[in-house]
Amino acid sequence: MGKNHISYVPLEQMDERMQEEMHRCAREGTPRPESSAVRAHAPNAFWAFADSWKAIFHSGVCDHAIKDLCRVYISRTVKCEFCGNQRSEKAIKAGLEEMQYDDLLNFEKSEHYDERQKAALSYAEAIAWGMPADEDAFWARLHANFSEPELVELGCAIALTFGQQSWIRLLGIDHHQYMAGTDASMAPGFRTAEELAASKSSPDYWAAGSAR
């Protein structure tokens, strides 16, 4: 990536509460500090995202691991490299394996997902790309796998990350540029600046291909 198109707000210019959130981002990830340091230009936007993300992505009634699969599906389909090279530590602890992130754009044919995960990913696909031809079958599948509270929460989480990632991919930001020295939530092969550079120069790098 080249030069950032919107600068990072220096940590020392933030108030104490915002600094605490930035340290949490560095310590826990998803999101990593760089995107939050851009949002810090508009504190109302910073907190609107941070509070909403905590409430509907990190917390709630729907399985967190499913929400993270959908988050990375969106990364792959809109090609947001900054977000797509992160993994939720909570989702990994819940049992998600790296191979399940690798096959997201082929989820319907993949053996790496169960029916509930595939239904959730079809929801993410529809939010990103539009309703499939058989609308009744689409909704029947979702209702067979999720309660209505889960569908609302999951839909809001997907919609939030879809909008944010569609914006973040334009910014030119990358990892290990702000509050460097931590690797929380970084995907394998991206945990240091050197690893990140090597992985992104590989012909097998996921973003080297086409989206969707």
What name fits each language-model region?
Residues 33-38, 64-79, 109, 145, ...:
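Alpha-helical scaffold segments that form or flank carboxylate-/histidine-based iron centers
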Residues 1-64, 92, 186-212:
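Mobile cap/lid helix-loop segments that border enzyme active or cofactor-binding sites
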Residues 116-157:
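Acidic/histidine-rich alpha-helical segments that form the ligand environment
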Residues 39, 53, 69-74, 104, ...:
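Short alpha-helical scaffolding segments that buttress acidic/His motifs in well-ordered protein cores
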Residues 69-86, 152-169, 192-202:
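N-terminal hydrophobic signal/anchor transmembrane helix of membrane proteins
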Residues 169-197:
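C-terminal end-helix/capping segment
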Residues 46, 84-103:
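Iron-sulfur (Fe-S) cluster-binding segments and ferredoxin-like electron-carrier domains
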Residues 104-115:
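Acidic/His metal-coordination segments adjacent to aromatic residues that form catalytic metal sites
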